[in-house]
């Protein structure tokens, strides 16, 4: 029975959709665009119009009038004609739809939609106009809608109003609760492509024991190896290990987490998959068949990668997927060769990487700028168990340091807060013997830096330690190296720095990048979708910072961090990479991820209420920290204003069942292996919510930008950021030492990442360092001003955007100040990674909202 009284009035609606084949990878012609195919649901515009009109039905749901305790449901109506709108984006189509209305129905607050077509389509939005006594209502949908038979309950979408649970209009409350229940699922069964279910699982999908022991990997999470949780797929288990999940070509994601928009990063991500499945095997064949030489002979040959390129086998391109980003990297120009763009670190000065100043500068303005710590004791001690590992007290002595302390003693330098350390020792020692049992050969490293009067850092000494040949309990075998600038000793010192950088490169990729951003954020994505309604204010605050994260993480588990994947092949830690990240996760602290807390914990800043950001930097010219504090403050101010708009008291927050369930599940399940840690916020005050939300947004946006988009600009020159070491340091009197004296460049290259691994590494990090054409950056949102109907948050968000623009101008001015030497360095590459905005491509700047690549 039609629930309306008078049927005379109409509500006009406009629905915007995208068809499935818009996101077909074969229709993409470049990293930025699509082929115009006269896009319609099934081909021609006429077909699309008739088809859509009869196959998609919609029912409005009242937010103000109830029927049986739930909002009244209107009569089903179909899409009508296709219309043209000036606001339509690429591949988008608009249709009009009319709804009958009377005053007994009230104001619409949601709608049901059914798709009776064979194919799914992407629903962008619905706008209802001229609603009596109300005006216009916006529904921002951004969701795939499959044939209705694939769903147990009808698909529902809510208007862009924002409500705490206690403020939800009574007719919508049950719909709100039911929709949350739908996306939680029941924890059983294998997930299907059209599912929208968010649930948790451990990392039991990295290996494939059925293919042999070489491919078996331990389960991470819920065991002695703690780990954040990932999305559950429900796939079956392997034959050999009932705890490991069977590999599959299809990796389930809740449908709207994958390809939910025309985004070239989807294809950047597919590029990574192509490197793993196509490029890697073909390159391996080329090297194994001696078509390509195994080693670089000198630094000039490395430079040729960017100037002339490497000639490829004649059939190379026919064997790799026709993915635009891959085509772009394997530039043919009529010939089959591999040529990379010159990385920024060598664009001005090809040998800047060899200087001590650049080596030191990159600890505070490079790829891994959040590891360096202050030295507060001397000699440096170890936290390793002495019974198991012997005495690991650092053997760097005063005699190694004081000649270069500018007249200070070590004690005075420590007192004046002038000594810093890059410490890659304790976490590596338990795995070092296993790592060195393969073709890789390396050391645990400790590097001491001195803060000079001109504000720059300089390395004073490097300790290289390897396991004692008679056993771990005897302690390490260690040597100390100090700077040298002439003869063979200059190359010994260059090698010592290379061992440090190899450790730093591994720690960066697997800990600072993968673990501390990608893996850490995934449980937040899952918990937010399971426990916070789409109309909850905190859902709307955090949602933009999750875009594409689960998608890129699932691809990473399949091609990057999986057993025998790209990371294991091209980074020193090899098969132990993910296991080591689990060991390091044990000591991860959520509250320390707030930038001011991180800086204070590492001793590179001290709390100072009179300082602009509440902390004073001890290395005043610390580009990552000084720029980051500007961004951190802007994020926190925006979050503070937003939270205060919706929660007028701590009591309101305490009584919010969705918020409390969200935080409880995040801590106890999502990061459940650390649930008993005392540092978790209790989520009893608005201040705790502001801090937790700001930390999450910081991790997903600025922290990820700082450790990701410099990968190619710094690491694209393998000489600057080697990822593997293959030989130990040559000892005096040995043939290797003599060879180093005669041909230092060749011997250096024999020690670091080999040619095959270099080509794979560069191909991947060039993709990872790119921005997509339709990326959303911090201070921007998809949907323009329609993500909420509340004017207060909309105005606050605009102020946030303006603040970020001001910060960017300030950072640009800073980079013009030549007295700030750490911003520029010998490589003459200003620190731009925390500029909020960017164009598409390889830009060395820009803070996307989310971890999208």
Swiss-Prot record:
Query: InterPro entries recorded for this chain?
Result: LipOase, LipOase_C, LipOase_C_sf, LipOase_CS, LipOase_Fe_BS, LipOase_plant, Lipoxy_PLAT/LH2, Lipoxygenase_dom_3
Q: In which pathway does it act?
A: Lipid metabolism; oxylipin biosynthesis
Composition bias type Basic and acidic residues, residue spans: 228-250
Q: In which tissues is it expressed?
A: Found in maturing and developing seeds. In young seedlings it is found in cotyledons, hypocotyls, roots and primary leaves.
- Compartments, record wording: Cytoplasm
**Induction of this protein: by what?**
By pod removal and methyl jasmonate.
Instruction: Alphabetically list the UniProt keywords.
Output: Cytoplasm, Dioxygenase, Fatty acid biosynthesis, Fatty acid metabolism, Iron, Lipid biosynthesis, Lipid metabolism, Metal-binding, Oxidoreductase, Oxylipin biosynthesis
Q: Which Pfam families does this one have?
A: Lipoxygenase, PLAT
Q: Where is this region: Disordered?
A: 213-250
Q: Does the keyword Lipid biosynthesis apply?
A: yes
* Record: residues binding Fe cation: 513, 518, 704, 708, 853
Q: What enzyme class is recorded for this protein?
A: oxidoreductase
Q: Which cofactor does it need?
A: Fe cation
Q: Member of which family?
A: Belongs to the lipoxygenase family.
- The name under which this protein is listed is Linoleate 9S-lipoxygenase-4
Gene transcribed to yield this protein: LOX1.5
């Amino acid at each position: 029975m039609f629930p309306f009284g008078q049927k005379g009035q109409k509500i006009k609606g406009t629905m915007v959709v995208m068809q499935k084949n818009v996101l077909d990878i074969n229709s993409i012609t470049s990293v930025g665009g699509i082929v115009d195919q006269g896009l319609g649901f099934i081909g021609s515009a006429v077909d699309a119009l008739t088809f859509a009109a009869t196959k998609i039905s919609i029912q409005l749901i009242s937010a103000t009038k109830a029927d049986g305790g739930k909002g009244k449901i209107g009569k089903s109506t179909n899409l009508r004609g296709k219309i043209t709108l000036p606001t339509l984006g690429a591949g988008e189509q608009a249709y009009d739809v009319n709804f009958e209305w009377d005053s007994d129905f009230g104001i619409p607050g949601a709608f049901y939609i059914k798709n009776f077509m064979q194919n799914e389509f992407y629903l962008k939005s619905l706008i209802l106009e001229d609603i009596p006594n109300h005006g216009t209502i916006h529904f921002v949908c951004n969701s795939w809608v499959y044939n209705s038979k694939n769903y147990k309950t009808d698909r529902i979408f809510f208007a862009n109003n924002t409500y705490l649970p206690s403020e939800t209009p009574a007719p919508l409350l049950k719909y709100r609760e039911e929709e949350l229940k739908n996306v939680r699922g029941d924890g059983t069964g294998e997930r299907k492509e059209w599912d929208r279910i968010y649930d948790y699982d451990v990392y039991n999908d990295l290996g494939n024991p059925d293919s042999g022991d070489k491919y078996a990997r331990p389960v991470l999470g819920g065991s002695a190896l703690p780990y954040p949780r990932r999305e559950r797929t429900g796939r079956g288990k392997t034959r050999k290990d009932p705890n490991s999940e069977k590999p599959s070509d299809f990796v389930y994601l809740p449908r709207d987490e994958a390809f939910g928009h025309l985004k070239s990063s989807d294809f950047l991500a597919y590029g990574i998959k192509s490197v793993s499945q196509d490029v890697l095997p073909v390159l391996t064949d080329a090297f194994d068949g001696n078509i390509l030489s195994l080693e670089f002979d000198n630094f000039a040959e490395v430079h040729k990668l960017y100037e002339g390129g490497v000639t490829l086998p004649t059939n190379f391109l026919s064997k790799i997927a026709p993915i635009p980003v891959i085509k772009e990297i394997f530039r043919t120009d009529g010939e089959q060769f591999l040529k990379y763009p010159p990385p920024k670190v060598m664009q001005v000065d090809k040998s800047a990487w060899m200087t001590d100043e650049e080596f030191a500068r990159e600890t505070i303005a490079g790829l891994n700028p959040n590891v360096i710590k202050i030295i507060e004791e001397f000699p440096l001690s170890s936290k390793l168990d002495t019974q198991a590992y012997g005495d690991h007290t650092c053997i760097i002595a005063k005699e190694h340091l004081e000649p270069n302390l500018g007249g200070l003693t070590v004690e005075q330098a420590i007192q004046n807060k002038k000594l810093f350390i890059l410490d890659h020792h304790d976490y590596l020692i338990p795995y070092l013997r296993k790592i060195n049992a393969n073709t890789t050969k390396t050391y645990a490293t400790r590097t001491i830096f001195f803060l000079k009067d001109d504000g720059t850092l300089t390395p004073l000494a490097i300790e290289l330690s390897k396991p004692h040949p008679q056993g771990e309990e005897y302690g390490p075998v260690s040597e100390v190296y100090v700077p040298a600038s002439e003869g063979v000793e200059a190359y010994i010192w260059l090698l010592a720095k290379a061992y440090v950088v190899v450790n730093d490169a591994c720690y960066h990729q697997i800990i600072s990048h993968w673990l501390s951003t990608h893996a850490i954020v995934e449980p937040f994505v899952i918990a937010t979708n399971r426990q916070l309604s789409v109309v909850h204010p905190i859902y709307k605050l955090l949602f933009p910072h999750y875009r594409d994260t689960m998608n890129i993480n699932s691809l990473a588990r399949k091609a990057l961090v999986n057993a025998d994947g790209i990371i294991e092949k091209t980074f020193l830690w090899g098969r132990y990479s993910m296991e080591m990240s689990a060991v390091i996760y044990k000591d991860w602290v959520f509250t320390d991820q707030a930038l001011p807390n991180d800086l204070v914990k590492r001793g590179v800043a001290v709390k100072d209420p009179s300082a602009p950001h509440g902390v004073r930097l001890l290395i005043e010219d610390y580009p990552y920290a000084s720029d980051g504090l500007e961004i951190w403050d802007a994020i926190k101010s925006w979050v503070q204003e937003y939270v205060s708009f919706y929660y007028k008291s701590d009591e309101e927050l305490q009584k919010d069942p969705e918020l409390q369930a969200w935080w409880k599940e995040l801590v106890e399940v999502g990061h459940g292996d650390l649930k008993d840690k005392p540092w978790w916020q209790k989520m009893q005050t608005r201040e705790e919510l502001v801090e937790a939300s700001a930390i999450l947004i910081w991790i997903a946006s600025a922290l990820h930008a700082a450790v990701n988009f410099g990968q190619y600009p710094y690491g694209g020159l393998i000489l600057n950021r080697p990822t593997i070491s293959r030989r130990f340091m040559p000892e005096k009197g040995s043939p290797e030492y003599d060879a180093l004296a005669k041909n230092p460049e060749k011997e250096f290259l024999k020690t670091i990442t080999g040619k095959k691994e270099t080509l794979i590494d560069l191909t991947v990090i060039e993709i990872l360092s790119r921005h997509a054409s339709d990326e959303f950056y911090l201070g921007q949102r998809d949907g323009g001003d329609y993500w909420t109907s509340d004017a207060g948050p909309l105005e606050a968000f605009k102020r946030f955007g303006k603040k970020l623009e001001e910060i960017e101008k300030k950072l640009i001015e800073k980079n013009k100040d030549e007295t700030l030497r750490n911003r520029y360095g010998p490589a003459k590459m200003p620190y731009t990674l925390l500029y909020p905005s960017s164009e598409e491509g390889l830009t060395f700047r820009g803070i996307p909202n989310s971890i999208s690549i």
